[in-house]
Regions:
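Positively charged n-region of N-terminal signal peptides that target proteins for export
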Residues: 1-6
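A cross-kingdom marker for long, charged
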Residues: 24-93, 97-305
Length: 305
């Protein structure tokens, strides 16, 4: 996919600017931010926020309103929240961080829309957890999680090796009422439009493989399982069966998701994906028109969007 290669080049330029601007690697920046956060906490707060790296809690994740472990934002003072946000800001790209902030802000909007008729909404009910001891050369993890947002990062020997599971969702999907100036706002519109654009471009013959069902899945296929392998069983149309233009569309979708993370890490991830581009599979379920329920996925040998 030539476009994916070009987009990768852009990210490489951004990644090269990271050391120039900050002078530190992901491991150095994230561990420094995490250590500052932990240093700002009182003993009882730190007890809630920290776990051993091998603790089973590290692989526990959930994206619905539920009881969680970790230290919630509501139990932090403004300074501590600032330190917590600093970890997120060096783990994500600027755009990824903005999306995360907008997801949390939508919880307040839901509270106003539902007026207490649904689950309790709380824009401060997002939890920060540190697994292991943050160290520039160490092995540790970081999680930021709440309703519709689950961000998980793992560092091994000081290198950021994983940003999954990663979950960004939006409710309402599109703001249709209330809040002057916000009506029409759709947080994940670009991701949605890119997937629909590719699906609509498929020919009748291609749709025999690419369209799995007229009915979308009723919920997230992976749920909060620890491993996604085999859940969709690599069904769909192979990237090798796409036209050049369609491959470019596929590359744009992949770039949009991967570039939520910091540029240097995203560049490495895109390089790895480009190496297995002929093994990618795209699948669509549901309607093709805006507003119709739908679900799409992109799957490779070791990952699932």
């Amino acid at each position: 996919m030539r476009l994916l290669t070009r987009l990768l080049s852009v990210l490489c330029l951004l990644a090269a600017a990271v050391p120039a601007a900050f002078g530190h690697s992901a491991g150095e920046e994230m561990s420094s931010a995490a250590a500052a956060f932990l240093g700002s906490l009182k003993a009882d707060q730190k007890a809630k926020a920290t776990f051993g790296f091998d603790d089973a809690e590290r692989t526990n994740w959930i994206f619905v309103p539920a009881a969680r472990k970790g230290l919630p934002l509501k139990e932090m003072n403004p300074g501590q929240r600032h330190f917590a946000q600093a970890i997120l800001s060096v783990a994500l790209s600027g755009r990824g961080h903005m999306k995360a902030e907008q997801i949390m802000a939508l919880e307040q909007l839901l509270l106003e829309i539902e007026q207490g008729s649904g689950p309790k909404r709380d824009a401060e009910n997002y939890f920060v957890s540190i697994f292991g001891t943050p160290d520039a050369k160490g092995t540790w993890g970081f999680r930021w999680e709440g309703h519709h947002l689950s961000l998980n990062f793992t560092l091994v020997n000081g290198e950021l090796v994983s940003s999954t599971p990663s979950f960004f969702a939006s409710n309402p999907g599109k703001i249709k009422e209330g809040q002057p100036g916000l009506v029409g706002f759709e947080l994940l519109r670009y991701e949605d439009d890119l997937g629909r654009q590719l699906a609509k471009s498929l020919t009748a013959e291609q749709r025999k493989q690419g369209f799995l069902s007229k009915d979308p899945y009723k919920d997230i296929v992976t749920g909060n399982k620890q491993k996604a392998d085999g859940l969709i069983k690599h069904k769909g149309i192979a990237a090798t069966a796409l036209t050049t233009e369609q491959k470019q569309m596929l590359g744009k979708i992949i770039f949009e998701y991967v570039s939520r993370t910091r540029p240097d890490f995203a560049a490495r991830e895109l390089t790895a994906i480009d190496a297995v581009k002929d093994s990618l599979v795209f699948a669509w379920n549901g309607g093709l028109e805006v507003g119709e329920p739908h679900y799409y996925s992109i799957q490779g040998p070791t990952f699932l969007f």
